[in-house]
């Protein structure tokens, strides 16, 4: 008896997920494999994917357009939370996994499958994100991960696939592992496994080298409503178009590159290169608008929440009770985060050049050092005495 009767497989069109199709059928006794490819803005990579899956033995090949849901329900929530894993990575790849898991579960329920599968290995983060998300959405579904068990080398995997008509798209001149969606690209492996090896310019597609960027700055006004980006330069845009246009603008000025060593869920460190132009700019602009519209205590407490929120996303806990509870807090904090942030793009930098909001709690008459100053300077002395009293008492005791 096979491990499952009917399986919905998360499909990318690459070697591993293509080999998963015959492997599931011939090694694990699966009767039917349905592939599902999520269109999250990979570009033309999804063109021939349906035909390839069918040639590899799938009984049906699904391609689902999830770009709008991805940006609106996943990326924009992350922006409201200023989510940066380890204060740097904007989770452009990690955010896609809970949505793909949701699509897998929905397809399994629609087609009567008793299992879902993915092509993740046992070394990466994505296996954790897929497995836990699927467990949360439908704990009755089996989760199969052939690449986690088959113990084949890259060469052996390709050879196995060729026995069953799987074509290998791998170019020997490209040793990198690359993942792409509308939010950005992640590049790893090959020469990048040496933390001292500088990335070559050829690995970047979304961002220009500084030498190739314009010699004049460009200003962009980003409009927000309740923490959600809604416009560029006063023009209201749908979520997908807004991200696409900002990717182009920021990338044209060399903005959006990251080179970091991060702590994976499975306990190892990994060197990663990321391109995420729009996402990084939006998080920075959003945080700046919050500084204008939120009280100090909300800002300081939210900083703690943001760190935990980022960890939950990275570690595959998008559908967890804690994540749901933090969502409620974050939404509440965004009620007055409405306004505009002006960003200046120039030579690899995206700096906030101005901000405004009808909900601003910045008071120029209190902040100024000019003649218009309304701040009560005399009140400062009493405040300092009370505020510093514990320190003074402690110092007196320590001195005996």
Curated annotation (Swiss-Prot):
L-citrulline binds at residues 89, 125, 129, 177, 186, 262, 274. One of its GO terms (biological process) is L-arginine biosynthetic process. GO terms for cellular component: cytoplasm. Gene3D superfamilies: Argininosuccinate synthetase, chain A, domain 2, HUPs, Single helix bin. L-aspartate binds at residues 121, 125-126. ATP binds at residues 10-18, 38, 119. Coiled coil: none annotated. It comes from the Bacteria. Pathway: Amino-acid biosynthesis; L-arginine biosynthesis; L-arginine from L-ornithine and carbamoyl phosphate: step 2/3. It catalyses: L-citrulline + L-aspartate + ATP = 2-(N(omega)-L-arginino)succinate + AMP + diphosphate + H(+). The keyword Nucleotide-binding applies. CDD domains: ASS. It is an enzyme of class 6 (ligase). Its main location: cytoplasm. It holds the Pfam family Arginosuc_syn_C. Activity decreases to 53.9% and 18.4% in the presence of 1 mM and 5 mM arginine, respectively. Activity also decreases to 80.1%, 78.1% and 92.1% in the presence of 5 mM ornithine, lysine and succinate, respectively. Activity does not decrease in the presence of glutamate, glutamine or asparagine. Belongs to the argininosuccinate synthase family. Type 1 subfamily. HAMAP family: Arg_succ_synth_type1 (MF_00005). A mutant overexpressing this enzyme grows faster than the wild-type strain under photoautotrophic conditions with 5 mM NaNO(3) as a nitrogen source. In contrast, the growth of the mutant is similar under photoautotrophic conditions with 5 mM arginine as a nitrogen source. Homotetramer. Catalyzes the condensation of citrulline and aspartate into argininosuccinate, the immediate precursor of arginine. SyArgG is the rate-limiting step in arginine biosynthesis in Synechocystis PCC 6803. This is Argininosuccinate synthase. The gene is argG.
């Amino acid at each position: 008896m096979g491990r499952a009767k009917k399986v919905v497989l998360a499909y990318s069109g690459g070697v591993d997920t293509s080999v998963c199709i015959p492997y599931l059928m011939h090694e694990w006794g699966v009767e039917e494999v349905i592939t599902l490819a999520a269109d999250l803005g990979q570009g033309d990579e999804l063109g021939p994917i349906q035909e390839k899956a069918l040639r590899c033995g799938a009984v049906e090949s699904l391609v689902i357009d999830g770009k709008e849901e991805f940006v609106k329900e996943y990326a924009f929530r992350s922006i409201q939370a200023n989510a940066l894993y380890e204060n740097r990575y904007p989770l452009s790849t990690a955010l896609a996994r809970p949505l793909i898991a949701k699509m897998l579960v929905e397809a399994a329920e629609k087609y009567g499958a008793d299992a879902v599968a993915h092509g993740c290995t046992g070394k990466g983060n994505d296996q954790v994100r897929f497995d836990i998300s699927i467990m949360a959405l439908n704990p009755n579904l089996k989760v199969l991960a052939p690449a986690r068990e088959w113990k084949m080398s890259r060469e052996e995997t390709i050879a196995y696939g060729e026995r069953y008509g799987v074509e290998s798209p791998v170019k020997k001149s490209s040793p990198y592992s690359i993942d792409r969606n509308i939010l950005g690209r992640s590049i790893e492996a090959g020469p990048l496994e040496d933390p001292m090896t500088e990335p070559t310019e050829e690995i970047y597609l979304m961002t220009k080298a500084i030498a190739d960027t314009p010699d004049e700055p460009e200003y962009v006004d980003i409009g927000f409503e309740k923490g959600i980006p809604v416009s560029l330069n006063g023009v209201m845009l749908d979520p997908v178009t807004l991200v696409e246009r900002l990717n182009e603008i920021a990338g044209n000025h060399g903005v959006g590159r990251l080179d970091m060593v991060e702590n994976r869920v499975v306990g190892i460190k990994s060197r990663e290169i990321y391109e995420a132009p729009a996402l990084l700019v939006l998080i920075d602009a959003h945080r700046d608008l919050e500084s204008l519209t939120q009280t100090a205590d909300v800002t300081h407490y939210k900083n703690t929440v943001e760190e935990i929120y980022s960890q939950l996303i990275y570690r595959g806990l998008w559908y967890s009770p804690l994540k749901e509870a933090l969502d409620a807090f974050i939404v509440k904090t965004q009620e007055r985060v409405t306004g505009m942030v002006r960003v200046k793009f120039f030579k690899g930098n995206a700096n906030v050049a101005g901000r405004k909001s009808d909900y601003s709690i910045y008071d120029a008459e209190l902040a100024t050092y000019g003649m218009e100053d309304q701040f009560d300077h005399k009140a400062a002395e009493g405040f300092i005495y009370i505020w510093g009293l514990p320190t003074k008492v402690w110092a007196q005791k320590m001195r005996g």
